[in-house]
Design a protein with these regions (language model features):
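Polybasic (Lys/Arg-rich)
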Residues: 58-151
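Core beta-strand-centered patch of the WYL/Sm-like small regulatory domain
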Residues: 1-65, 70-75
Length: 151
């Protein structure tokens, strides 16, 4: 059995997710279509300090595939042809900064996860992690591991 204090519903990758506080896992996500046997209890909802200040719309954009984790500032560089994709993912208010004639940079908070790396890898050489170096190095290591499978 799970007990969760609900905070928000978000739409991600064709599914609704409940963002909630779990006694076991803290801030977590549950895919709504996978829920069964729900019960409303008389237990008071847990409202953490984190939840009181969290912008759930922004949070939903930072999380890829609803993987939990700590959000961190990530600076990315894309070819101009991907501007529409970035705006679709992060919203029309995303600030795209020109970087030469063929690229732009974009800085945002992202929960770094395998799903984020997979999304980025799909763009091949048209996208690059610029900062932080730890995220850049982890992505490069993931790419090397995958490449080893094909040698």
């Amino acid at each position: 059995d799970y007990f969760a204090s609900p905070y928000a519903l978000v739409w991600d990758n064709e599914n609704y997710y409940l963002i909630a506080h779990s006694e076991r896992h803290g801030l977590t996500h549950y895919r709504v279509d996978k829920m069964a046997k729900l019960t409303i209890t008389q237990k008071p909802r847990v409202m953490t300090e984190e939840a009181k200040t969290l912008d759930f719309t922004r949070y939903g954009k930072a999380v890829f595939g609803m993987f939990s984790g700590q959000a961190q500032q990530v600076k990315l560089r894309f070819q101009n042809s991907l501007a529409g994709v970035v705006l679709d993912r992060f919203g029309k208010d995303a600030m795209l900064v020109p970087d030469g004639n063929e690229h732009f940079t974009f800085t945002t908070e992202i929960v770094v996860s395998p799903v984020f790396y997979g999304w980025l890898a799909g763009f091949g050489e048209r996208a690059e992690i610029l900062f932080p170096e730890s995220v850049r190095a982890e992505f490069a290591a993931q790419c090397r591991k995958t490449l080893e499978l094909y040698k």
